[in-house]
Amino acid sequence: RSLKEVKDQSRIFGQVFLTYIEENAQILWEDVSESASDAVAGLLKQSQAKQGEQTESVSLDQIPEYSDSPYVEINGNVPSFSDEKSAGPAYEFYSELDSLGRCGYAESKITPELMPDEERGAIGMVKPTGWHTVKYENVDGRYLYNRCHLIGYQLTGENANKKNLITGTRYLNVTGMLPFENEVADYVHSTGNPCMYRVTPFFKGDELVARGVEMEAESVKDQKISFHVFVYNIQPGIEIDYTTGNSWEE
């Protein structure tokens, strides 16, 4: 099958079934017949598990202040994916934007078939909440902000998907998130095994720029990949107004 066909199917599982079933999980689970497909039955259970996982997520108040490291381990560095999700089909899911236009969590069961085989296209047309085009001499590459993929392009081939892009500092994108993305990508490429992956942006109140992102991953077959971290959306030497995205040198 082509990459487009695989992604279309994964989106059906992730964006149609999971969204619809999340709203009707209990009723559907009680009424589902023995003749229901294993995939649909599994998704029903996945949705129920997902609801529990999301409500148990760490809160921003529990995250320590930034202190020289781009990330901090949370929940004992243990991810919280359900067995039902891990055993289910490949999928990708991107939350709807909230009333302020902000991204919610993005999640996928990453497989080699979902990973792109072509270079990333243009994404400059997407303006995530809090976006400003601003340069500083003391920032690598000079641009303070990047359009940060929640699920990196190399993992699911999502390009200019506004549900998957947030305003993130160069430090968040390259120093913080990229090493974890590369770890997952290298594992899936080298083994062919699937890996669960979820990234959740953390916004404080009505702020338009996320304070950071929660990243979780777990390889399904051997647990060689397993992490649960919070990556800070900061830039050393730069102060950020997270309400507006405005910034200035310290």
Question: Where is each model-derived feature located?
Answer:
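N-terminal, intrinsically disordered, polar/charged segments of Gram-positive cell-envelope systems
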Residues: 2-83
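Domain-level detector of nuclease and nuclease-like folds
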Residues: 81-250
